[in-house]
UniProtKB/Swiss-Prot annotation:
A ubiquinone binds at H201. It comes from the Eukaryota. Keywords: Electron transport, Heme, Iron, Membrane, Metal-binding, Mitochondrion, Mitochondrion inner membrane, Respiratory chain, Transmembrane, Transmembrane helix, Transport, Ubiquinone. The lineage of its organism: Eukaryota, Metazoa, Chordata, Craniata, Vertebrata. It comes from Martes flavigula (Yellow-throated marten). It is found in: Mitochondrion inner membrane. This is Cytochrome b. Heme b b562 binds at H83, H182. One of its GO terms (biological process) is mitochondrial electron transport, ubiquinol to cytochrome c. Gene3D superfamilies: Cytochrome Bc1 Complex, Chain C. Its cofactor is heme b. The cytochrome bc1 complex contains 11 subunits: 3 respiratory subunits (MT-CYB, CYC1 and UQCRFS1), 2 core proteins (UQCRC1 and UQCRC2) and 6 low-molecular weight proteins (UQCRH/QCR6, UQCRB/QCR7, UQCRQ/QCR8, UQCR10/QCR9, UQCR11/QCR10 and a cleavage product of UQCRFS1). This cytochrome bc1 complex then forms a dimer.
Amino acid sequence: MTILRKTHPLAKIIYNSFIDLPAPSNISAWWNFGSLLGICLILQILTGLFLAMHYTSDTATAFSSVTHICRDVNYGWIIRYMHANGASMFFICLFLHVGRGLYYGSYMYPETWNIGIILLFAVMATAFMGYVLPWGQMSFWGATVITNLLSAIPYIGNSLVEWIWGGFSVDKATLTRFFAFHFILPFIISALAAVHLLFLHETGSNNPSGIPSDSDKIPFHPYYTIKDILGALFLILVLMVLVLFSPDLLGDPDNYIPANPLNTPPHIKPEWYFLFAYAILRSIPNKLGGVLALVFSILVLAIIPLLHTSKQRGMMFRPLSQCLFWLLVADLLVLTWIGGQPVEHPFITIGQLASILYFAILLIFMPIISIIENNLLKW
């Protein structure tokens, strides 16, 4: 067996990635989210596959096909709600995973970090298109509003929007192509995740102290396999509590109303995991400016490695940076809250201030505080 696992081309890759991988001895539970994201992805692909067996991507029947899944298909309701709430769990793990990377300086592995940003965009695109498929009110109007943002692109904007729609409005062609893309993207995400892992295993994992751990490595199995299984059990517990007790907690009631192009919902808003970006988009009165801010709110992560001015890698021993990091987390929570509120007096100003603070922390305060901490080390 030992000979086979070290010689067989396929077994060698699997064993070197999940069994014999040298891992730092001090990585905390914050390093569990990579495996949890893998589990979420597998879960989403499997539940999605079973949903696709019964779903019809036609404007006339899409809404009723989802109803049919919930009412008539054996355990269809649990598959549907596991898929919908699985997306929420996916994003919770994603945000915590990115937050861990920011806190502990994992962005100092630029290849892994940049593939991660591409993965984030791909998952966001997949989730957006998936939200359109049930063809409820929020599906239709969400698709209309978000795709319409592309019309802000100079010269080609309007043509681009009509090209994406496949007509002059969000209609049958749009739904069909969104279903096709929603089906294929998770497999592209799987391939990207494999590349993400490939780059990570070139350098080895970071650890909480930020100090190279080459002299102190332990095998991944059994130490971290058992740790990952514990994390997975906790993830499944939370997901199943959500699915079985309050499956609609994170959804929008408007999506139980079939799509009607003649009736606009009072408040158009995306799923909760996009609200922070939606708040940044709305905080800028100009359409093109808003779209740029929306894209840059995620793309800003790509320039974080260039703005690293500290002599230490992580924030474990940098209390000033820690304060700033948690201020950023609080700011993102405020943005998420604002994204779900109507566009009226106090919320507009709060949203604009929170958006300015978001970019200011990442682009201005973090590098400056790091320089101050470097100077404090000299005393």
